């Protein structure tokens, strides 16, 4: 079984993001990716990861008002597992490659193939921005981060566009604001990491944000959901080999 740790914060308590790769134990097994709700813990990451390897997980494919879901129940051995969410729902789209193999309303035991743990800052220092351009109110522009990575193994550059936030800017001010973004961005971001959670996430650690970035908060780690950005690649390979080269920001008019 594969296990992998992405350590973006060294301290306690910390926020733990746990993702598992599963295979159903039935006659037509589906491969699933299930991520646990974020939780806070004081357990050293290496100890937590070892105890996560004892996970037993069952899933039930059913329906909800928001579409097909998997009802997940989990148990594991070890004192650290008291903080782990034991019962929760995830979107059935996690079963990306084997959607047709899921059997409706059947409780299925799953075999654990891989477990991934990402450590982040404590509650209150982690902000989650879903990769969606939907916003409430009359917004005129979207702030987009263009995160440049280098695949160290293949020597191939990769750019990931990520929606950060929607803002209202007067047309007469748009040129001035856009020109200021470059300097503000130099102060705003210190690092970006790819981590396995909800498929893939990008964790951006904000330093001393100004201007358009100031609402994100200094010292905050921003989570941007990427989903299954690269389905054909090993998630752990991406996490090990994609090195952040820099981040550019653009304002996109709506």
UniProtKB/Swiss-Prot annotation:
Source species: Avian metapneumovirus (isolate Canada goose/Minnesota/15a/2001)
Pfam families noted in UniProt: Matrix_Pneumo_C, Matrix_Pneumo_N
Chief location of this protein within or outside the cell: virion
UniProt record similarity statement: Belongs to the paramyxoviruses M protein family.
Gene from which this protein is expressed: M
GO MF, one example: structural constituent of virion
SS bond partners: none
Keywords: Host cell membrane, Host cytoplasm, Host membrane, Host nucleus, Host-virus interaction, Membrane, Viral matrix protein, Virion
Alphabetical list of InterPro entries matching this protein: Matrix_Pneumo_C (IPR055461), MATRX_N_pneumovirus (IPR005056), Pneu_matrix_N (IPR043062)
Protein name as it appears in the record: Matrix protein
């Amino acid at each position: 079984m594969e296990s992998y740790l992405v350590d973006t914060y060294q301290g306690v308590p910390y926020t733990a993001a746990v993702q598992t790769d599963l295979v159903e134990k039935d006659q037509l097994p589906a491969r699933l990716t299930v991520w646990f709700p974020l939780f806070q813990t004081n357990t050293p990451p290496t100890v937590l990861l070892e105890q996560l390897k004892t996970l037993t997980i069952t899933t039930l494919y059913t329906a909800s008002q928001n579409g097909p879901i998997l009802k997940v129940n989990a148990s594991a051995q070890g004192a650290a597992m008291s903080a782990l969410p034991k019962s929760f729902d995830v979107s059935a789209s996690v079963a990306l490659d084997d959607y047709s193999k899921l059997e409706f309303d059947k409780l299925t035991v799953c075999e654990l193939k891989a477990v991934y743990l990402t450590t982040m800052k404590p509650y209150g220092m982690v902000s989650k921005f879903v990769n969606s351009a939907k916003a409430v109110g009359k917004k005129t522009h979207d702030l987009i981060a263009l995160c440049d990575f280098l695949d160290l193994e293949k020597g191939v550059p990769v750019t990931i566009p990520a929606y950060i936030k929607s803002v209202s800017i007067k047309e007469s001010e748009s040129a001035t604001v856009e020109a200021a973004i470059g300097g503000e961005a130099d102060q705003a971001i210190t690092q970006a990491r790819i981590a396995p959670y909800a498929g893939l996430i990008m964790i951006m650690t904000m330093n001393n944000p100004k201007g358009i970035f100031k609402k994100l908060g200094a010292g905050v780690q921003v989570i941007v959901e990427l989903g299954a950005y690269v389905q054909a690649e090993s998630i752990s390979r991406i996490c090990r080999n994609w090195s952040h080269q820099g981040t550019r920001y653009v304002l996109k008019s709506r």
